[in-house]
Amino acid sequence: MTSRNSINRLPFKLTFLLQSLVLLFFASCSRIDHKQSALDPKGLVAQNQYDIFMLSVWITIFLFCAVGGCLLYVLWKYRAKSKDEAMEIPEQMHGSSKIETTLILASAVILVILAVPTLQGVVLMNRVPDPNDQATLEKLKLDKSQIEDAITVNVTGKRFFWVFEYPQYGIVTANELVFPASKAVRVNLRTEDVIHSFWLPKLAGKVDLIPGQENFLWFIADQNKIQQR
């Protein structure tokens, strides 16, 4: 009987091993330095979004390991030792109120840990810092000169191409956004036809351009040359 059970479990172990190897193989194919990778931030706003993302990733990994570990322990601890035991219906009972309360409180704490930096990130993305707010500038490690006279770019989404207008300089370009490093850039977004998505993965988040609605985003680049195609 033991030998037959071992033979029956062999395909499952082999399948699990093969699945793990395939998963590791595809994970090794990823590239952090890809031109459009949001995991390689080059600006203040993108760095803030990256930090929030990694915080949620580490919390998710911890919860996955904790819940998975508890599940495996229970499956091993209370497994059926024999066929007769497997046919028995176990005693039905209500769970522990203390455990349920602890899990609810722990979930609330985790939500707060995620909510606070997320809300701060939303505020940061939706408002260019006031150059006269010294406390905010010190918190963000910015100089007043970086925020003053921020560059304005009016972006219009059209079918098959983008139009970039620099009203302060009287310049209009197509499909290429040019700006200096270490200087705040405010991008006003609008569309003349269909819905477009404007995204600078290394600099800021993705914003949708909705017909009849104007949106905006802002960023500060950390380096002089950033190419995205």
How would you describe each model-predicted region?
Residues M1-R31:
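N-terminal secretory/membrane targeting signals
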Residues S20-L24, Y73, G157-R159:
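Alpha-helical structural elements
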Residues S28, F53-K81:
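Alpha-helical transmembrane segments
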Residues S30-F53, W76-R229:
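Non-transmembrane, membrane-proximal soluble domains of secreted or membrane proteins
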